């Protein structure tokens, strides 16, 4: 043990050798000696290099610290004597110094690795924040994102993590990120779904083609792996418009009611959403009907707003938002192959759109038409250009993939003398006095076509040609026009002139040379010409969009709100904030759910003061019957806060209420307690009615209250029902569609007012009252053997909101419901016949069947019915009709809850629609 003090002294002398900071040195020394001092006895601690001779090793006094590296062992014996430095061994000194340096460096790496890892994670998260953003509907290849990460680590001199660890780091920043495997079989790749590259990122231009001159500029990334599936509009089902400018942020000129403006904007957004839904479902012809109905059926109290310049400009902004979403929906930016039928439908839609808008705006302020039509024309032009380009792209793609065709084109274009064509191009500018340095010269034309030749040699795809054209237009048109102050339009005209002339001379040479690939090259040239025109028009449209943005900024109090209107993207879920005026009662807000209500007018002799509001009409043809002095029911209780629902689609859901009333939250809208509630009549009407007539006939009448639900229990056979979405149905009798129309076999109208309000002995005679017709304010009675049995007016009748609108014949209101509009929620299904679903054997068609209970039951009303079934107690038969009717009832139908839960509800068959009053629903039934 004699050499132990020498070894100890040697180690102490060797300690200052490593140049370490005091903190690190102290930390390393504590880790080097501290654990050994705690594990081993105070008398025996050894420090020696592994394999060092001369170190006396006692059996029970020797141990190996598990925290030390395998090449270093700590063994040292401490005694109470003084350390001596008189004997030194040079070899031991060197070995001890190296061992200590090696151990300290290794321990430094181990202790710092945790800190470095945390620091690197923070840097990575910050880098992700700066370069990427949550972007719904965007796919980013996982390999590209990891390549960006490796580049980031190289620049920051960090040790990159593996792909799996990097994936966990990404999910720390984007927890909702998902992965998808996209591409053809055998060539699919994993993609991150829901993340996109920020435009401010340095990686944006390296991934996306160019600066995005058109919607197709970034398609190279999206098409990675290749898409073979044809584009379908069904993939866009559920698309909803972004928020329109809010009336709360508008600066008005003059005295304008903010509530009216808010109502008008909300109505217009619902109208635009309806147009979008029909476009997604391919019902382009129906869009014309919606346009006509919205503008020609504008409520009178909102018409003055259409002359206000601020409101007109807001309409233009809303149109721009709608057209951008329509373009994104109809034409895929991925350049997927589109079915020929869809392309033809879009072309036809673009061809007719301007005429549809002009027709719908007749008899409205000219200022509104003058502002809307230029935006319409830009939309139509863009739609035509993009469909044309997409059609050419999917035709040219097979030619570019055919190696034989590509080789033939390269061989033929090599024989064309581009320099000789360039000299001819001087003729086009010989008389020009423009001496600007940025002018597009013949040399530029030769260079551009030489680049085209090189692309063909490289077997470039359509996406590669688009990327190249983006660069050409950016460098030779847009950039130069900004540098020398020349207008973009002048520069674009000059470029197109030279490009077209040079291309025509190339085709001329190919024709003279009998080029075998003339047809293929002509196709490629048409594709390039179309894209250049599209890029130019896109730049012009962007300038117009900026003008609209500036216009909106002028009218908005909050600049951020105006920018949000143009930067917002369409979504796939929607929850409307229904702002109800404080002065408007709950009765003034129309129930948008399917709550069928029987509306009974009070005759002029009835107390209540409703006589002047409702007029009777003599028997005759209802189609040509004039309506004079008619009063809007909606005006009695104040303006409605929401637009009406079509009488032909009262059972549908909408993007606002999303389903039946039973499923609506209390905050969305008022919940009516009884189906007999009439929302268009104000409460002050009821106190004017005598107490004895609360049941409209008498207190002992078998008829329930028609205008509102009574708090007390009514006498008679017909109980009240308070379930939402219910209607008071007839048990045995199914109503044909003629029940709702204005035509019957016999005398349809009875000019004789009711003689008394007492109960009748027969059910047939007791219905001697007048019902509101769904098409107009005509009244039906059911006296006579061939008369109608009455009509049910939905709470959303157009007459209650739009007034006396008789421009639309009855035949359009209750036409065929087979080709219905499908909303953003429900699926696309046609309406099957009732007999095929509920009665395939025609068992229910039994007129002699025994009546089971009272006329009114608690079963829900179906939306469609076929062959009517007669109740045994009715003396007068109802004319049978094969046409479908909207509201026919039978207790054979399943409950409403079952229909809603199993998805077989008639609400889905008729398919929901945003709440806009649709009056054009196809052809009429039998006698209309």
From Swiss-Prot:
Q: For this UniProt entry, which residues form the secretion signal?
A: none
Q: Note down the stretches annotated as region Disordered.
A: 1-20, 50-98
Query: Tell me, what's a Pfam family for it?
Result: RFX_DNA_binding
What does changing residue 506 to G do?
A: In MTCHRS; inhibits the transactivation of the insulin and beta-cell L-type calcium channel genes
Function (record text):
Transcription factor required to direct islet cell differentiation during endocrine pancreas development. Specifically required for the differentiation of 4 of the 5 islet cell types and for the production of insulin. Not required for pancreatic PP (polypeptide-producing) cells differentiation. Acts downstream of NEUROG3 and regulates the transcription factors involved in beta-cell maturation and function, thereby restricting the expression of the beta-cell differentiation and specification genes, and thus the beta-cell fate choice.
Its subunit composition reads: Interacts with RFX3.
User: This protein is called what?
Assistant: DNA-binding protein RFX6
Name its species.
Homo sapiens
State the gene name recorded for this protein.
RFX6
